[in-house]
Amino acid sequence: MRRRTFLGMSSGLGIVATGLTTTPALAGGRRPDLTVAVDGGGDHTGIQAAIDAAPAGATEPFVIGVRPGTYLGQVVVPATKPFLELRGLGRRPDDVVIADDRANGTLKPDGTPWGTSGSASVTVSGADFRAVNLTFANLFDEAAHPEITNRQAVAVLTRADRLVFDRVRFLANQDTLYVNSSAAGVVARVHLRDCYVEGDVDFIFGRATAVFDRCRIHSLNRGSTPNGYVTAPSTDITNPYGLLFQRSRFTSDAPAGTVLLGRPWHPGNDPNAIGQTIVRESWIGAHIPDAAWSDFGAWPWEDARFFEYRNAGPGAIVSANRPQLTAEQAGEYTAAAFLRGSDDWTPERC
């Protein structure tokens, strides 16, 4: 898709999903410490410049307010800068767009490819990061680059712990949202509430512990069968908590029965990556078939930790192909349990 079409089509979908048409960005928040404005009316004109100007080693939030506009270029939040907040100052999440357009196979100046992680429009390595009321996008145009076969194009890559995304849109095609950690066996928690995530192949993936609460998960129609896979978790075997979707909506423009809920990703054929995806108390559209889970190469989905609980909608089918949590298990696999950790983190109170 062309960039303008991509953003225009997606913006309406995200707003309908979250109902965020009239929520002022400043309500209930502290005043920004720095302001970014593409027209030069703020402290900086670019997102990265503002992040570079933020203090290192902070112990309380440092707020960067972003005025409406489209901000192009890769953004990196380094591990040395915890407690950063990017806050969109528009009335809707699509008023502020932070985007880049490279893919896995896009070549660097030295002739080597960027790779999947290197393709990310935004990389978050700083703990206690927060993003509010804005859009992250990877605008890589697959149709315009048939010469590139490795088309993974990440909008956001997370590697840190205790991250919050509130009323945020994530837009791309393959590999939109990469929720990861700094290393295998290291737990990194992410809380996403009232968000919108759009893509086609494995577009929510990684080994982080991530809770999606009241989110809309939208699968694009890429004109194939299967049309894609929503999740590709690579949860470490030592981590009891992977990807949790609760009170969310799974939607698509794709034909009925052509999108899978997920498949187990084993990076580098790691046998200890026993992915977990749980979908509970959510609405699932007809694009999800009876056999909702898929093998990933030689790795069978039955060996992963895939479960559902009390879902509704035409795609919420209870069968032998759709493992369900028991009531007792459902009491254990809650958002609070996923996010609590050893430090009793409660982001819903933030």
Regions found by a protein language model. Give the residues of each.
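N-terminal export signals
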Residues: 5-25
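Sequence-level preference for short, compositionally simple segments enriched
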Residues: 30-350
